[in-house]
């Protein structure tokens, strides 16, 4: 193998790694009180009304993050963390039916009562697992970094008393894009 080709491939691999794990400083916009910002970079894939496990109506917002999106996860609003659980698992292609149950995932509940956002991060084909630096009862500030996920799907569950401020197909940036408000 030619040394120039090997040097080129090494440089390309280095650039890809630096790009995938970049951690840009973000200026957190000052939205009105009770605002909810995006937890991950990506594209809004779906917004629907669902019935949650408590039998209450909620909004379900799905964000798909790819390899080219920033992988840093950010806090949706200033609050206390109610739950934080990381479930280790596989990193299979999302087209495989079992991937939904077997892939690594992280469940976090931000806030309590009527001001609560449930977040589920599911990893898809990735060489790096989900990193979560939160634990229960942590006090967190809107836009603060709390973890890392390269190539995955993030589901946000908002209470039905919230107002959603995004549309399907919209590109969102963690900590900067307004997802909605608590009413």
Where are these regions (language model features)?
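Contiguous, well-folded functional domains in the mature portion of proteins
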Residues: 1-183
């Amino acid at each position: 193998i030619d040394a120039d080709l090997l040097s080129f491939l090494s440089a390309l691999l280095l650039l890809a790694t630096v790009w995938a794990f970049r951690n840009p400083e973000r200026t957190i916009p000052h939205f009105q009180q009770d605002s909810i910002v995006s937890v991950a970079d990506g594209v809004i894939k779906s917004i629907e009304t669902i019935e949650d496990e408590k039998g209450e109506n909620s909004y379900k917002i799905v964000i798909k993050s790819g390899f080219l999106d920033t992988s840093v996860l950010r806090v949706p609003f200033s609050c206390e963390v109610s739950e934080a659980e990381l479930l280790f698992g596989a990193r299979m292609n999302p087209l495989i039916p079992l991937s939904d149950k077997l892939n690594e995932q992280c469940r976090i509940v931000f806030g309590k009562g009527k001001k609560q956002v449930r977040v589920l991060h599911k990893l898809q084909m990735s060489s790096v697992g989900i990193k979560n630096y939160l634990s229960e009862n942590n006090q967190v500030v809107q836009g603060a970094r709390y973890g890392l996920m390269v190539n995955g799907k993030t589901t946000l569950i908002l209470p039905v008393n919230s107002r959603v401020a995004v549309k399907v197909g919209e590109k969102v940036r963690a900590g900067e894009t307004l997802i909605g408000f608590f009413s």
